[in-house]
Regions:
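C-terminal secondary-structure termini that scaffold catalytic or DNA-interacting sites
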Residues: 3, 335-348
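N-terminal core-binding DNA-recognition domain of tyrosine recombinases/integrases
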Residues: 32-48, 56-144
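Flexible interdomain linker/hinge and immediately adjacent N-terminus
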Residues: 120-168, 213, 252-257
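Basic, Lys/Arg- and aromatic-enriched nucleic-acid-binding interface segment
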Residues: 159-192, 218, 243
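C-terminal catalytic core of tyrosine-transesterase DNA break-rejoin enzymes
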Residues: 183, 288-312, 319
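Conserved tyrosine-mediated DNA breakage-rejoining catalytic core shared by Y-recombinases
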Residues: 188, 193, 197-230
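Active-site/catalytic core of tyrosine-dependent DNA strand-transfer enzymes
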Residues: 226-279
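Catalytic-site neighborhood detector that most strongly recognizes the C-terminal catalytic loop/helix
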Residues: 309, 314-334
Length: 348
């Protein structure tokens, strides 16, 4: 028995277009799709909904290998269900990343709780703990902690691209469309999905402003750098095909000419130029990190950077603030040179 994810067109506004079904019969996996419907009604972003669907598809395939069905019965759930699922993923070859394992376990946990609210906790009790909640007035009453069934995620130290790397990578592009995309990531800090979701009316060149739909469909307005304004203007006047679509960035050639540029197309574009220039770390998210680091070097405040990047929590912004060892050395040298405290000298 095999399962896969399909996208269906439905007039029902309360039904998710993404469905997990049996491959041979097309029968839906009810408990999974009911959870997807709930998240769809909550207006979960399309990319997040797709991630949930494929995470649950992986769980269903694992469950079917043990129980010979994709349907989950409340009596089959035990306190070690998700722990067993986590162990299965950890033993997989090639290994899954820690963040992938954690995301899949978390989604399966929520979907099972949604379907069986009175069933035994599918997370082992040993992973539950009480903690004292810290509030504005100090420590409050004990509360049950969230599930600690998580694989430790190694801390990544993403070093921003150097000026030379950015220049070499950018010199490989030939169209204003591609340069405008790079400019929006490097000078505005946009995510890949934010760039691809831009429409023509989101660009206000006369006011040098850009309207961006971020995660959770949250809107924010960003100032446009003069270089980005020039590239966008050139692309819209001279390169963009005269098509009826509202999309800003469209395919420029081939059968898909005039249709909205896809994530696969964007990845292919960056992959090609990485191979051409030898800049192996040049990817959309690395440009976003470079944007944050450049603004920090320029003296921007963290609250302002948080607004520009579309973060809801400043702790998320702090993870993007990475400076190079050369920056640390230069700032240290500058600080030491400004010291007025005399240093002890050896006695003669």
């Amino acid at each position: 028995m095999r399962f896969h994810v399909i996208r269906s067109q439905t007039p029902n506004p309360a039904q998710s277009p993404l469905r997990v079904v049996e491959h041979e019969t097309g029968r839906e996996v009810g408990w999974v799709n009911r959870y997807l419907d709930r998240e769809y009604v909550r207006r979960l972003a399309d990319a997040s909904l797709r991630s949930c669907a494929y995470s649950l598809l992986h769980f269903v395939r694992w469950w079917e290998s043990l129980h010979h069905t994709g349907d989950v019965v409340e009596g089959d759930l035990t306190e070690s269900t998700l722990l067993d699922y986590e162990k299965f993923q950890c033993s997989h070859q090639p290994p899954f990343s820690s963040s992938t394992i954690n995301d899949r376990v978390a989604v399966a946990d929520r979907a099972l709780r949604n379907e069986f609210p009175d069933a035994p906790d599918p997370t082992a009790r040993g992973f539950q703990q009480a903690f004292l909640r810290r509030g504005p007035l100090g420590l409050g009453r004990p509360r049950v902690g969230m599930s600690r069934l998580r694989v430790r995620v190694p801390k990544r130290n993403l070093v921003p691209l150097s000026v030379e790397e950015v220049a070499r990578f950018g010199s490989s592009f030939r169209t204003a469309r591609d340069l405008a995309i790079v400019g929006l990531m490097l000078l505005e800090g946009l995510r890949s999905a934010e760039v691809l979701s831009l429409n023509e009316d989101d660009v206000l060149l006369s006011e040098a402003q850009l309207r961006v739909r971020g995660k959770g469909n949250k809107l924010r307005f960003l100032p446009l750098a003069p270089e980005t304004v020039q590239l966008l203007d050139h692309y819209r006047r001279l390169e963009r095909p005269p098509v009826g679509t509202a999309a800003l960035f469209v395919s420029l050639k081939g059968p898909a000419r005039g249709t909205r540029m896809t994530l696969a197309g964007l990845r292919s574009l960056f992959r090609y130029h990485r191979q051409r220039t030898g800049i192996k770390l040049a990817n959309p998210h690395r440009f976003r990190h470079t944007f944050a680091s450049d603004l920090v070097r320029g003296g921007i405040s963290l609250p302002a950077l948080m607004q520009l990047m579309g973060h809801a929590d400043i702790q998320t912004t702090l993870r993007y603030v990475q400076i190079t060892p050369q920056d640390v050395y230069q700032q240290y040298t500058r600080a030491v040179a400004q010291q007025v405290r005399p240093l002890p000298r050896p006695s003669s």
